[in-house]
């Protein structure tokens, strides 16, 4: 038996300023503290405490048909660990810029560029031991540096009363991508170490939707991502997907949905991985929503998932050899107050 004891605090203060030279924005500070103590047969982490302090800001302004947004964030993180491994103390600086161009009625073209820095997590720094939930033996790396990436994303949007669509293309370049690298494998049990290497990820995501009438709306969607670490395939990268969905709002209370998607084979796999077969997924749902007093709301729902009872394997999982849930049914209640 393993016991996880986590105690943490988090606070955030934001200041929204009046327009300055037509720039509007918000600045703020954020602070958090977390103590983690893991005991038992799966105690993969020594007791540790993470303190993090952040300063952030976002500014935006309209220039005719162009909307410009700038953002920045400065993080300081300290991780104290109760072991012979060295403590972590570091800073990260991120910034971004975005331009949205309303070049025609109902159309918008967007371009986003950013430099992102991520501080390593305690798990990535200090893990040491068997983690049977992922069927791995994990080795942390207290020599990890900040993960740094330069990113660009291009998007096209269209939206009117009936038809809407969007397409996004993105590319991310990493100087020192942090990932769980498999060093060895016995049957399906892996020895992994948190490592850093140059990497790049690029892909696309798109959706087109059509509102037939006040009740029915249908959409087509798809996404694809490709990951490379140095010249090799990145591990646990999900396969491409295409699908269609129909939503129905029958009245103020009843709604329903049906979705079909096809996930392709993933034949671009990393060392110690294997090809993952694709599958077809069919899900349906029905819900009844009603309002209560004082703005409270309740929704009773029924979902039927994987109606084809497909053998589903997720390449992005550490347990990609274990099938996901087959045909299943869910009944539940959502209550908002």
Predicted features, each with a name:
Residues 117-118, 173-175, 253, 265-267, ...:
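C-terminal beta-signal and adjacent terminal beta-strands/loops
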Residues 11-17, 55-61, 97-101, 154-158, ...:
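Residues on the lipid-exposed face of transmembrane beta-strands in outer-membrane beta-barrel proteins
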């Amino acid at each position: 038996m393993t016991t996880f004891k986590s105690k943490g605090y988090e606070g955030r203060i934001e200041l929204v300023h009046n327009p300055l030279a037509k720039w509007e924005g918000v600045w703020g500070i954020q602070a958090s503290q977390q103590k983690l103590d893991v005991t038992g047969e799966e105690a993969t982490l020594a007791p540790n405490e993470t303190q993090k302090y952040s300063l952030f800001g976002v500014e935006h302004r309209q220039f005719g048909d162009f909307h410009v947004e700038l953002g920045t964030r400065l993080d300081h993180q300290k991780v104290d660990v109760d072991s012979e491994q060295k403590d972590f103390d570091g800073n990260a600086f991120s910034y971004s810029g975005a331009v949205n161009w309303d070049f025609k009625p109902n159309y918008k073209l967007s371009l986003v560029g950013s430099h992102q820095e991520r501080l390593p997590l305690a798990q990535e720094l200090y893990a040491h031991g068997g983690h049977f939930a992922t069927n791995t033996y994990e080795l942390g790396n207290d020599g990890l540096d900040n993960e740094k990436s330069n990113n660009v994303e291009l998007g096209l949007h269209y939206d009117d009363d009936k038809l809407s669509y969007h397409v996004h293309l993105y590319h991310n370049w990493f100087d020192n991508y942090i990932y769980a690298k498999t060093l060895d494998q016995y049957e399906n049990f892996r020895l992994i170490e948190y490592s850093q290497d140059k990497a790049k990820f690029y892909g696309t995501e798109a959706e087109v939707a059509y509102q037939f009438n006040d009740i029915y709306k249908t959409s087509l969607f798809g996404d694809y991502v490709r990951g490379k670490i140095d010249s090799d395939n990145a591990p646990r990268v999900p396969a491409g997907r295409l699908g269609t969905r129909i939503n129905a709002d029958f009245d103020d209370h009843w709604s329903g949905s049906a979705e079909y998607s096809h996930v392709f084979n993933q034949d671009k796999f990393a060392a110690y991985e294997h090809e993952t077969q694709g599958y077809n997924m069919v899900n349906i749902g029905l819900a009844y929503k009603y309002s209560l007093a004082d703005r409270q709301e309740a929704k009773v729902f029924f979902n039927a998932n994987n109606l084809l009872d497909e053998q589903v394997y997720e390449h992005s999982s550490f347990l990609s050899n274990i099938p996901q849930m087959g045909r299943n049914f869910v009944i539940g209640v959502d209550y908002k107050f």
